[in-house]
Amino acid sequence: MLYWLAEWLGFPGALNLIRYLSFRSGAAVATAMILGLWIGPRFILMLRMRQGKGQPIRDDGPQSHLAKKGTPTMGGLMILISLMISALLWMDLSNRFVWACLFVTAGFAVVGFLDDYDKVTKSSHRGIPGRVRLLVEFLIAGVAVLLIVSRTGTDLYLPFFSGIVIPLGPFYYVFAMVLIVGFGNAVNLTDGLDGLATFPVIIASLTFLVIVYLSGNVKFAGYLGIPHVPGAGELAVFAAAIIGACLAFLWFNAPPAAVFMGDTGSLALGGALATIAVTAQHELVLVLVGGLFVVEALSVIIQVFWYKRTGKRVFRMAPIHHHFEQLGWPESTVVIRFWIVSIVLALAGLATLKLR
C-alpha cells in the first residue's frame, strides 16, 4: 500500500527510499516484529481465556510434556496478523507473485485454524479429517501454481549444476502442488517442541530472502547462473515480514512456551516458504534448506509404513524429535541441536548459488 502511495506521489524526497527492496525488506522486518511484540501479550491472554484447557497433550508422549497442559494454541494467528499487515504495507501489490504467496499463506492458515479449533473444542488430537484437509490444501496450492507458472514456466533447475534443466511440462504443476502441500505439512509435523519450528523457519526465510532477491535481479542471476525471474525480488519483502513476525513469536514461544503456534501458523509458514521457492524456481534448494522439516516428515511416513507392514517401529516415537527425547535428550538439547542443523543446511543451500 505504501509503495502504491509513494508511486502515485512520484516518490518525492524521502519516499524515494520505498523504491528499494532493501529498504522495504528492513522495514517489513521491523514492522512485523514490533506488531508481533505489541499484540503478543494481549493475544495470549485472550487465547487463555477462550481455550481453557489449551492444546491437548498426547498421553503417549514424553512425560515432560504433561507440564505443558493448559498452554494455549492458535498462536499462529499472532504471526499471521503481523505478517499480513507488514506485507500489505510494504509490498508492491501489483505483483502477481505477491498475491500467490498471500493466497497460500491465508488459505493454509484458515485450514490450520479450523483444525486447531476442532482439536481444542473436542479436546482431541484428530482435528478435521485428513483427506478433507489435504484436498483443500491442494486446491489452494493449485490456484497459486497457476498464477506463478504463467510467468515462470515448467522447467526444473538442478542445484549445483549450471544450465542443466529438466523440462517437466504439465507434470510440473503436480510437482509444485505436492511441494507446497508437503512442505506445509512438514513444518506442521516439526512444530512439536518449544521453538523447534520457529527458528528454522526464520533461517529458511532469510536464505530465500537472499535467493529471491538475486533471482529477481537480471545481473546477479546472470552472474551466478541461476534462473532469472522478473518480479521475484518483491518476495524478499515477504520473506522479511515472515522473519519479523517469527522473531516476535519466538519471544513468547521460547521455553517454557507461553503459546503454541498450532496448525494455524505452521501450515501457513510452510506453505509460504514453498510458494516462494516455486516462484524463484529453486524448488530442490528448498528441500536442502528445509531438510530438517523434510526429515521430520519422512520419519513419520517411514514409521507409519513400517508399522503397518511389520507391526514394528523404526523409531521409538515419531516425528523424529520425539525419538531423541525418548533416547533421553532434554527438550532444550533437541531444539538447539536441530537449530544448528537448520543453519548448516541453510549455508549449504546458499552455497548452491555459487558452486555450479
Curated annotation (Swiss-Prot):
It is an enzyme of class 2 (transferase). This is Phospho-N-acetylmuramoyl-pentapeptide-transferase. NCBIfam families: mraY. One of its GO terms (cellular component) is plasma membrane. Pfam families: Glycos_transf_4, MraY_sig1. It is found in: Cell inner membrane. It comes from Sphingopyxis alaskensis (strain DSM 13593 / LMG 18877 / RB2256) (Sphingomonas alaskensis). Signal peptide: none annotated. Catalyzes the initial step of the lipid cycle reactions in the biosynthesis of the cell wall peptidoglycan: transfers peptidoglycan precursor phospho-MurNAc-pentapeptide from UDP-MurNAc-pentapeptide onto the lipid carrier undecaprenyl phosphate, yielding undecaprenyl-pyrophosphoryl-MurNAc-pentapeptide, known as lipid I.
